C-alpha cells in the first residue's frame, strides 16, 4: 500500500491524455519547462546577489570628537571677551 503499481500509472496516463488531449500535452510540457527554466535563473540570480552583498565590506562608523572652541583658537578661557 502507498506505492503505485504499473497499472495505476497506465490508468493515470490514459486519464491525463483523455482530459487534456494529445495536442495540448506537448504545449503543457513546453510551458512547464520554460517556467522551470525561468525559476532556476531567478534563484541563481538571487544567490549571486546575496554573495555580492556579503562580499561588500560594511563601512566603519566615523568617530566624532568634541573640540572645545576656546582651546582650539588658542585663547585662554580667563581672558575677557569683547562685547
Swiss-Prot record:
Tell me which stretches of the chain form a coiled coil: none
Instruction: Give membrane topology per the record.
Output: Single-pass membrane protein
**Example GO biological process:** protein transport by the Tat complex
Instruction: Decide whether keyword Transmembrane helix is in the record.
Output: yes
Task: Explain what the UniProt record notes about the effect of disrupting the gene for this protein.
Answer: Essential for growth.
- Protein transport among the record's keywords? yes
Name of this chain's protein: Sec-independent protein translocase protein TatA
Gene name in the database record: tatA
User: Family, per the entry?
Assistant: Belongs to the TatA/E family.
- Which GO molecular function annotations are given, in alphabetical order? protein transmembrane transporter activity
Keywords, A to Z?
A: Cell membrane, Membrane, Protein transport, Translocation, Transmembrane, Transmembrane helix, Transport
The segment annotated Disordered runs over: 48-83
Q: Where in the cell is it found?
A: Cell membrane
Function, as annotated, reads: Part of the twin-arginine translocation (Tat) system that transports large folded proteins containing a characteristic twin-arginine motif in their signal peptide across membranes. TatA could form the protein-conducting channel of the Tat system.
Name the species this protein comes from.
Mycobacterium tuberculosis (strain ATCC 25618 / H37Rv)
Q: TM segments?
A: 1-21
Q: How does it assemble?
A: The Tat system comprises two distinct complexes: a TatABC complex, containing multiple copies of TatA, TatB and TatC subunits, and a separate TatA complex, containing only TatA subunits. Substrates initially bind to the TatABC complex, which probably triggers association of the separate TatA complex to form the active translocon.
User: Where is this chain compositionally biased, Polar residues type?
Assistant: 57-77
Its GO CC terms are: TAT protein transport complex
